[in-house]
Regions:
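Short, glycine-rich nucleotide/cofactor-binding loops
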Residues: 11-24, 56
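Histidine-anchored nucleotide/phosphate-binding helix
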Residues: 23-38, 42
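C-terminal structural segments of small proteins and small subunits
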Residues: 91-94, 98-117, 122-123
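Short, flexible loop segments at the rims of nucleotide/cofactor-binding pockets, characterized by
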Residues: 58-63, 98-102
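N-terminal beta-loop-helix "entrance" segment that forms/cooperates
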Residues: 48-62
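Short internal beta-strands
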Residues: 40-45, 82-86
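Basic/polar N-terminal segments that are highly enriched at the extreme N-terminus
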Residues: 1-5
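A glycine-rich helix N-cap at a beta->alpha junction
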Residues: 59-86
Protein backbone atom coordinates (compact mmCIF):
# COMPACT_ATOMS: atom_id res chain seq x y z
CA UNK A 1 0.00 0.00 0.00
CA UNK A 2 1.29 3.49 -0.77
CA UNK A 3 2.10 5.82 2.08
CA UNK A 4 -0.49 8.47 2.81
CA UNK A 5 1.82 11.50 2.94
CA UNK A 6 0.51 15.01 3.48
CA UNK A 7 0.58 17.45 0.58
CA UNK A 8 3.77 19.51 0.49
CA UNK A 9 3.91 23.01 -0.99
CA UNK A 10 7.19 24.78 -1.69
CA UNK A 11 6.84 28.52 -2.28
CA UNK A 12 9.82 30.36 -3.74
CA UNK A 13 9.97 34.11 -3.07
CA UNK A 14 12.43 36.21 -5.04
CA UNK A 15 10.90 39.62 -4.28
CA UNK A 16 11.45 41.59 -1.10
CA UNK A 17 10.36 44.96 0.23
CA UNK A 18 10.56 46.46 -3.28
CA UNK A 19 7.41 44.48 -4.20
CA UNK A 20 5.36 44.22 -0.99
CA UNK A 21 2.38 42.56 -2.66
CA UNK A 22 4.36 39.61 -4.06
CA UNK A 23 6.31 39.37 -0.82
CA UNK A 24 3.11 39.24 1.22
CA UNK A 25 1.21 36.83 -1.05
CA UNK A 26 4.00 34.29 -0.50
CA UNK A 27 3.08 34.11 3.18
CA UNK A 28 -0.69 34.42 2.68
CA UNK A 29 -0.56 31.30 0.50
CA UNK A 30 1.75 29.51 2.91
CA UNK A 31 -0.57 30.14 5.85
CA UNK A 32 -3.59 29.03 3.81
CA UNK A 33 -1.85 25.77 2.91
CA UNK A 34 -0.92 25.14 6.54
CA UNK A 35 -4.56 25.68 7.52
CA UNK A 36 -5.38 22.89 5.04
CA UNK A 37 -2.88 20.56 6.77
CA UNK A 38 -0.26 20.76 4.02
CA UNK A 39 3.43 20.87 4.79
CA UNK A 40 4.86 24.25 3.72
CA UNK A 41 8.42 25.31 2.94
CA UNK A 42 9.07 28.93 1.94
CA UNK A 43 12.33 29.38 0.02
CA UNK A 44 13.73 32.92 0.07
CA UNK A 45 16.13 33.73 -2.77
CA UNK A 46 17.44 36.91 -4.41
CA UNK A 47 15.81 39.98 -2.79
CA UNK A 48 13.36 37.64 -1.07
CA UNK A 49 15.98 37.05 1.64
CA UNK A 50 15.00 40.42 3.13
CA UNK A 51 11.65 38.88 4.12
CA UNK A 52 13.42 36.98 6.89
CA UNK A 53 15.87 39.72 7.84
CA UNK A 54 15.44 41.66 11.08
CA UNK A 55 14.86 45.33 10.36
CA UNK A 56 13.24 44.65 6.97
CA UNK A 57 10.33 42.26 7.39
CA UNK A 58 8.74 44.42 10.09
CA UNK A 59 8.27 47.25 7.58
CA UNK A 60 6.62 45.45 4.65
CA UNK A 61 2.95 46.26 4.16
CA UNK A 62 0.75 45.52 1.14
CA UNK A 63 -2.69 47.08 0.76
CA UNK A 64 -5.49 44.71 1.69
CA UNK A 65 -3.28 42.22 3.55
CA UNK A 66 -2.08 41.70 7.11
CA UNK A 67 1.42 43.07 7.79
CA UNK A 68 4.19 40.78 6.57
CA UNK A 69 5.60 40.31 10.08
CA UNK A 70 2.27 38.93 11.30
CA UNK A 71 2.09 36.50 8.36
CA UNK A 72 5.70 35.34 8.77
CA UNK A 73 5.28 34.81 12.51
CA UNK A 74 2.04 32.91 11.91
CA UNK A 75 3.64 30.65 9.31
CA UNK A 76 6.39 29.68 11.73
CA UNK A 77 3.96 29.20 14.64
CA UNK A 78 1.80 26.90 12.50
CA UNK A 79 4.80 24.69 11.68
CA UNK A 80 5.89 26.11 8.34
CA UNK A 81 9.55 26.19 7.39
CA UNK A 82 11.49 29.16 6.03
CA UNK A 83 14.81 28.51 4.30
CA UNK A 84 17.09 31.32 3.16
CA UNK A 85 19.65 31.18 0.34
CA UNK A 86 23.16 31.47 1.80
CA UNK A 87 24.84 32.89 -1.34
CA UNK A 88 21.99 35.44 -1.59
CA UNK A 89 22.44 36.71 1.97
CA UNK A 90 26.21 36.79 1.55
CA UNK A 91 25.86 38.87 -1.64
CA UNK A 92 23.76 41.36 0.34
CA UNK A 93 26.14 41.42 3.34
CA UNK A 94 23.44 39.91 5.58
CA UNK A 95 24.77 37.71 8.38
CA UNK A 96 22.95 34.69 9.77
CA UNK A 97 22.61 36.62 13.06
CA UNK A 98 20.44 39.14 11.21
CA UNK A 99 17.93 36.47 10.18
CA UNK A 100 14.71 36.14 12.15
CA UNK A 101 14.46 33.25 14.63
CA UNK A 102 13.35 30.13 12.81
CA UNK A 103 14.79 31.06 9.40
CA UNK A 104 17.25 28.41 8.23
CA UNK A 105 20.23 29.39 6.05
CA UNK A 106 20.65 26.77 3.31
CA UNK A 107 22.43 26.12 0.04
CA UNK A 108 21.14 24.78 -3.27
CA UNK A 109 21.15 21.09 -2.33
CA UNK A 110 18.58 21.58 0.43
CA UNK A 111 16.36 23.70 -1.82
CA UNK A 112 16.44 21.10 -4.60
CA UNK A 113 15.67 18.34 -2.09
CA UNK A 114 12.63 20.25 -0.79
CA UNK A 115 11.40 20.80 -4.35
CA UNK A 116 11.83 17.16 -5.35
CA UNK A 117 9.78 16.08 -2.33
CA UNK A 118 7.03 18.65 -2.97
CA UNK A 119 3.61 18.00 -4.41
CA UNK A 120 3.61 21.55 -5.82
CA UNK A 121 6.19 24.31 -6.26
CA UNK A 122 5.13 27.91 -6.92
CA UNK A 123 7.14 31.10 -7.26
CA UNK A 124 6.38 34.74 -6.48
Amino acid sequence: MPENKPEKLVIVATHGPEDPERATITFVMGNAALAMDAKVVVVLQSNGVHLATKGFYEHVFAAGFDPLKKLVDSLLELGGTIVVCVPCIEARKITTDQLIPGAQPVKAGRVVSEMLEATTVVSY
